[in-house]
Amino acid sequence: MVLELYLDLLSQPCRAIYIFAKKNNIPFQMHTVELRKGEHLSDAFAQVNPMKKVPAMKDGGFTLCESVAILLYLAHKYKVPDHWYPQDLQARARVDEYLAWQHTTLRRSCLRTLWHKVMFPVFLGEQIRPEMLAATLADLDVNVQVLEDQFLQDKDFLVGPHISLADVVAITELMHPVGGGCPVFEGRPRLAAWYRRVEAAVGKDLFLEAHEVILKVRDCPPADPVIKQKLMPRVLTMIQ
């Protein structure tokens, strides 16, 4: 049976899975679950992921719902090149270290930045208090600095001389604030050079394909009132 991936490329972890699968020629059937239409909240999608979140994966009768778990499953099952998730214990531990750190730090601040700058005011028509936006951008700056100083340092990639899962997860996170109009790479030459290396390692065409939605997100139309009412209870937690 064909591997099934339930994705919306608006979502940063969905983009990471999409890039990884495409780059490694992993055959899959993609089901687009449109977050801005509330399709992830449907009873039909709840049969795939009861938590009603993307990404999700079905491999025959086996389902998996967390992005890092899906990436590791694909890396193990399809025997991808070693640099993605190295066999070397310490190199693998560095990938794991980044994946463990980013979930409540860089991912959170990148997500909040996009929502505070674009999704709430443009898509949902809800204004964010200036002091809240300022705090969000300050938090983003702190986490980007940690990424640069603690993880990237002076290496070509986050874990060494070759691209890994850590780099794909990190770059897809950073493209969220980029899509929201934040110049996160300006004034950061090491990070900007890393960005160019990741884009080249992935392939520019695939990189742009995966990020087409997020790079056009500021042009999204306002939400339908019914959709807005459906989405608001879940997304309000992002501005607390």
Curated annotation (Swiss-Prot):
What tissue expression does the UniProt record report for this protein? In liver, highest expression found in central vein limiting plate hepatocytes. In lung, expressed mainly in club cells of the bronchiolar epithelium and, at low levels, in type II alveolar cells.
UniProt KW keywords? Cytoplasm, Transferase
Annotated Gene Ontology MF terms? alkylhalidase activity; glutathione peroxidase activity; glutathione transferase activity
InterPro entries per UniProt: Glutathione-S-Trfase_C-like (IPR010987), Glutathione-S-Trfase_C_sf (IPR036282), Glutathione_S-Trfase (IPR040079), Glutathione_S-Trfase_N (IPR004045), GST_C (IPR004046), GST_C_Theta (IPR040077), GST_N_Theta (IPR040075), GST_Theta (IPR051369)
Q: Which residues form the GST C-terminal domain?
A: 88-223
Return the EC number. 2.5.1.18
Q: Could you tell me which SUPFAM superfamilies the record lists for this protein? A: GST C-terminal domain-like, Thioredoxin-like
Q: Which reaction does it catalyse?
A: RX + glutathione = an S-substituted glutathione + a halide anion + H(+)
UniProt function note: Conjugation of reduced glutathione to a wide number of exogenous and endogenous hydrophobic electrophiles. Also binds steroids, bilirubin, carcinogens and numerous organic anions. Has dichloromethane dehalogenase activity.
Its name, as the record gives it, is Glutathione S-transferase theta-1
Q: Which organism is it from?
A: Rattus norvegicus
Q: Which gene encodes it?
A: Gstt1
